[in-house]
From Swiss-Prot:
InterPro entries: Cyt_b/b6_C, Cyt_b/b6_C_sf, Cyt_b6/f_cplx_suIV, Cytochrome_b_C_euk/bac
Keywords linked to the UniProt accession: Chloroplast, Electron transport, Membrane, Photosynthesis, Plastid, Thylakoid, Transmembrane, Transmembrane helix, Transport
Bilayer-crossing regions: 36-56, 95-115, 131-151
Protein name: Cytochrome b6-f complex subunit 4
Gene assigned in the entry: petD
Amino acid sequence: MGVTKKPDLNDPVLRAKLAKGMGHNYYGEPAWPNDLLYIFPVVILGTIACNVGLAVLEPSMIGEPADPFATPLEILPEWYFFPVFQILRTVPNKLLGVLLMVSVPTGLLTVPFLENVNKFQNPFRRPVATTVFLFGTALSLWLGIGATLPIDKSLTLGLF
């Protein structure tokens, strides 16, 4: 790793550049009018054109019509609701299930306050936040996979 030299603030050339505005906020060209009038509309219109083009060239099929008299044997929610569905399915008391679901965001909101004295960004130097993240990820995967299985195999994932 090289040694970086600190700037000499007594240098008249550097002082003249800083006085002219060439400091930490000098980026080359202003955002007005170049970016806001010319580049942003091109990006926005390009995004709209891509969406319209995909909608015209590859229209999404609606699917089979719904039959209200033929329901599936087991109704499953969308994949992102699997952990919550598994909690409600396995906990016998509905109030306890709702409290467990409320405790998830509450617990996530308390994590920054547990490690607010730690100024590091490296996950290996923040053991509490890293442990909470890994435990929450493993628990969500376990509950999500278990929600796709029958109720008698859902807690053990059919392994035991």
